[in-house]
From Swiss-Prot:
It is found in: Endoplasmic reticulum membrane. PANTHER family: PTHR42735, SPHINGOSINE-1-PHOSPHATE LYASE 1. Pathway: Lipid metabolism; sphingolipid metabolism. Its EC number is 4.1.2.27. The keyword Cytoplasm does not apply. This is Sphingosine-1-phosphate lyase. The lineage of its organism: Eukaryota, Metazoa, Ecdysozoa, Nematoda, Chromadorea. InterPro entries: GrpII_AminoAcid_Decarb, PyrdxlP-dep_de-COase, PyrdxlP-dep_Trfase, PyrdxlP-dep_Trfase_major, PyrdxlP-dep_Trfase_small. The chain crosses the membrane at residues 32-52. Residues 53-552 are cytoplasmic. It comes from Caenorhabditis elegans. Pfam families: Pyridoxal_deC. CDD domains: DOPA_deC_like.
Amino acid sequence: MDSVKHTTEIIVDLTKMHYHMINDRLSRYDPVVLVLAAFGGTLVYTKVVHLYRKSEDPILKRMGAYVFSLLRKLPAVRDKIEKELAAEKPKLIESIHKDDKDKQFISTLPIAPLSQDSIMELAKKYEDYNTFNIDGGRVSGAVYTDRHAEHINLLGKIYEKYAFSNPLHPDVFPGARKMEAELIRMVLNLYNGPEDSSGSVTSGGTESIIMACFSYRNRAHSLGIEHPVILACKTAHAAFDKAAHLCGMRLRHVPVDSDNRVDLKEMERLIDSNVCMLVGSAPNFPSGTIDPIPEIAKLGKKYGIPVHVDACLGGFMIPFMNDAGYLIPVFDFRNPGVTSISCDTHKYGCTPKGSSIVMYRSKELHHFQYFSVADWCGGIYATPTIAGSRAGANTAVAWATLLSFGRDEYVRRCAQIVKHTRMLAEKIEKIKWIKPYGKSDVSLVAFSGNGVNIYEVSDKMMKLGWNLNTLQNPAAIHICLTINQANEEVVNAFAVDLEKICEELAAKGEQKADSGMAAMYGMAAQVPKSVVDEVIALYIDATYSAPPSTSN
């Protein structure tokens, strides 16, 4: 007791001494100056804290962006940028409408109704704008089924019955409600969901990812975490960036290892008290590589952090790979640490666009996704997803597709796609001007250039009728194989065309690209992100624009 008392007295004496010392030094300043200094210091501190919490980007990068935002307010800089953007706008509009043959545009309601024959004729004309051979396997991803007549016929009949149904009103549309519940449960069972598991139908993979992040944001807030962080590999889908932006979260990116899988040591190092979810991809979109889900799940269990598996791309491939003869690590709810999964039915599930499933290990976690207003004057308002009204027809045709295909058909398609994916990967590895990018674990083959500009390769492949996906950081392209590419004829044709183009470019030597993807990505690498964002905005605007020369 005496030692504690003595220590306390020493602390008190030291405190008094420093108090008088500080007070004596500050006494020479005007009190108003001290108040203003304290106020200014507090303001600077709060601004710095806000800047830190706003983004996971390095401070220097954010400072550079801030400095550029100030510079572009200068008349000379602003005028230069606006002039360049103005010159770019008509080019973008022209590129969007290049396949619009007649340049006619409907901008007002017709006074009298058009006949059904006229409408169908117009729809057929618009359909003919497409110049890529989708069914012939020339398009990477996009359309994941072969669109056979029997399936299309079934979809038409189902849509006819459920075109105006809306699961928001389960009492009015009990059949649509049941279809939605059955669709969710079928997919949950594919992913070995436990008895208490639950989920929702969404409009697509992006909404499924947003919903999962929204749930974990709400869970984090309930635990007192004010500034929740998503911890995801840098190859995770950009929908996580969108979710972080919409939900007021921060996204912390984890680097990859030599195989383009998440670096587990770095992931563990980056975990702190603000991390509210860990993310693994099965597979990721850029290279088609599956992250080590069992190990990520163990990290989640170790630190008590929910783990989300993004299986949007491979959602209707990976559950069937073992049966198809391709063994992969456990990716689903059999991992105790996995708490949620996103899975697109409208990709390899072969359903029409507009359906995806977000799944949760428990109803308790699912409840964090729900939104309700119990005291609204219009009555109690409650929705499970972002949407209020939901297209029951989208759920109905997805439900019908799963039932009409059955497990055996999905296994057959999976085996065919994986077989030809690996066949193509082997052929591409033999092309000396190409370097594989990541591992082709499921249905993607990604590659970069080895002495050739890979974006020029993409441009020239497009001229031969191949529509591929361009990647960046690093520069690469990929082809996503669907059932339409899963045959030797397409695989061989792709490999032959790719090698031929690489030979031509290698013989030509390094030259500056002035058009196409090569020019666009070259520009994007050299100008500030804010300017790139403005060009992107112009491009999106162009997709809603009338053709350059129109008559109503």
